[in-house]
């Protein structure tokens, strides 16, 4: 929903169809979307999503490790291969010139290095939050508290991510988006 409604993204791979069983996670990224630029270009969005009971520092390594796995050549090639072999984009993109350009970009012969500048990685961390649990209305006090808390967690997350992933080739050309979503509790 966030990808479609906020970023106007097109679903490129319906991940639900690639689960092996009910308790299985989708392999590779959790979501695969294409965002069309107003100037006729496009971006590849490979998303990661986690649900935590807290955002303490120790929990932040798991999504970073998942992103590291996602950036490995075999996994990125697999995602691109699935995308070009499905007709999901054919149903959503009427501009045939753009569709051809997208499919050529994700062709098996295209270097991953050519894809990385088009790559966006949204990382959604849905988390239990005491600030949200103790709030009954959307007050300025609540907004300021949650902004301050999320800013602190985002700084910690990106510091850890840079330390772990900055050696990935063309890391600086990849766009990362951290989306922190507080909920009162899991139930």
Feature locations, PLM:
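Long, mid-chain structured domain cores
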Residues: 1-7
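Acidic, metal/cofactor-coordinating or nucleic-acid-engaging core segments within structured domains
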Residues: 60-147, 155-156
């Amino acid at each position: 929903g966030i990808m479609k409604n906020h970023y106007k993204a097109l679903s490129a791979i319906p991940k639900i169809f690639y689960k092996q069983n009910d308790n299985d996670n989708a392999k590779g990224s959790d979501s695969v979307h294409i965002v069309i630029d107003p100037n006729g270009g496009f971006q590849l969005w490979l998303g990661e999503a986690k649900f935590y009971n807290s955002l303490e520092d120790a929990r932040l390594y798991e999504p970073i490790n998942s992103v590291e796995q996602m950036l490995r050549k075999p996994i990125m090639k697999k995602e691109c291969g699935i995308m070009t072999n499905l007709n999901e984009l054919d149903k959503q993109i009427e501009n045939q010139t753009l569709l051809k350009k997208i499919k050529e970009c994700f062709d098996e012969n295209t270097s991953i290095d050519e894809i990385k500048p088009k790559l966006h990685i949204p990382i959604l961390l849905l988390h239990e939050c005491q600030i949200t649990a103790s709030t009954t209305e959307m007050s300025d006090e609540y907004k300021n508290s949650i902004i301050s808390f999320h800013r602190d967690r985002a700084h910690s997350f990106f510091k850890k991510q840079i330390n772990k992933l900055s050696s990935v080739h063309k890391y600086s050309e990849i766009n990362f988006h951290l989306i922190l979503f507080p909920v009162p509790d899991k139930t």
